[in-house]
Amino acid sequence: MDHSYPYIASLTRESFLFYEMRSTAKLMSEGFSDDAIVKEIVEQNLFQYPTEKSITRMAKACIKRLHALEDDSLVSAIASQPTDVAKQICLYALMKQSRLVWEFMLTVIGEKYRLRDTSFGKIDLNTFFMRLQEQNDTVASWSDSTITKLKQIIARVLVETEYLDNLKADRKSVV
C-alpha cells in the first residue's frame, strides 16, 4: 500500500459489499466491460437496491475494488470459490482500496497474530483510531460520528470474514 494514498472515509458508504462484489466479479469473469457490468447490474437490479442511482454507485465501487486486485485469477476466485475463500479475497480487495483498512489489518490484526494474541476488543479499535487521529490531519478532521461508524464497519468486516465470531467477541478466531 502506497503511504501517499490518502485516508478516505468512503467505507461508511461502501462497506464490505460481499454479495455485490461476488455478482460483479461473475460478470467481470464472463468478460463484460465495466460499462456493460454497470448496465447489467442496473437492468437486472442484481443488488436489490431501491434506486438506480445507488445501484450504479455501488456497481462502480465494486468494479473499482475488483480492479484494485490487479489479478484476474483473484476476481475469478471471488466469483467461483467457496464463500470463506471469496470473503478473504474481498477483504484483500478492500485493503488494497482503503489505506485505513490496510493499516488496521496490518498494525492491529497482523500484530496480534504475530504475537499469538487472540484477544480483541473495542480498545483495539479505539487505540488504532486515536493513534491515527494524532498522526494524520485528515483523520483528525473526521467527525466523531464518522469515526464511530468506521469502527462499527471494521468490526462487522471482521465478523463477516470470520476473524471474530460476533460483534461482542473478545477473542479472534483462527482464520
Segment roles from a protein language model:
Residues 1-88:
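Eukaryotic partner-binding/assembly regions in large regulatory complexes
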Residues 21, 101-102, 122:
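Short, leucine-enriched amphipathic alpha-helices that occur as contiguous helical runs
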Residues 59, 63, 151-156:
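Short, hydrophobic-biased segments on the C-terminal half of alpha helices
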Residues 88-92, 96-118:
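Positively charged, polyanion-binding regions of nucleic-acid-associated proteins
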Residues 174:
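Conserved small/polar residues in nucleotide/adenosyl-binding loops
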Residues 122-130:
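An amphipathic alpha-helix signature
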